[in-house]
């Protein structure tokens, strides 16, 4: 009986925690923070991990940057609705899928998590240019898990370009609603450190091309 009450109490606390609003730590720099989310496609490179042949390599790119102060832009959601929507496992036993849904109901409701980034805000005119930091989450995590760090860097005058790679990141949800999962062939435990490093370098090179600068420049002229 005591055990049952203990479990019930724990579940109740988890449910209350799920329903409680949470705001990320306030950035410590002097700049306001803007954020844009983009779908970049490399027309010259095929994605060798895509389930079908002929798929061009895509990246989901998140850019945090120093934003102009005093504008009427909207504070963006910590996560867009389509990203935070629960995504059930694509396959597997029914029991596993049910447990995954139950676990999702007892973890924090991400719609109640709030950040400090303005959606597609104008770039701050205080400097002619800003240094760029390329951010890639470790293993197969999504880059939005590092939003607090990205916002803080942007508030200190850095452009932070983070990206998720389909079939390599755990789950990638593009703005148009497409969901791409990591493939079993890309389990990080199957690769050596050198192999993982070479893969990360190639992905970072794709992001480091002039397109990142061009994307931020667009916000200077909106």
What are these regions (language model features)?
Residues 13-133:
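Domain-level recognition of soluble alpha/beta enzyme cores
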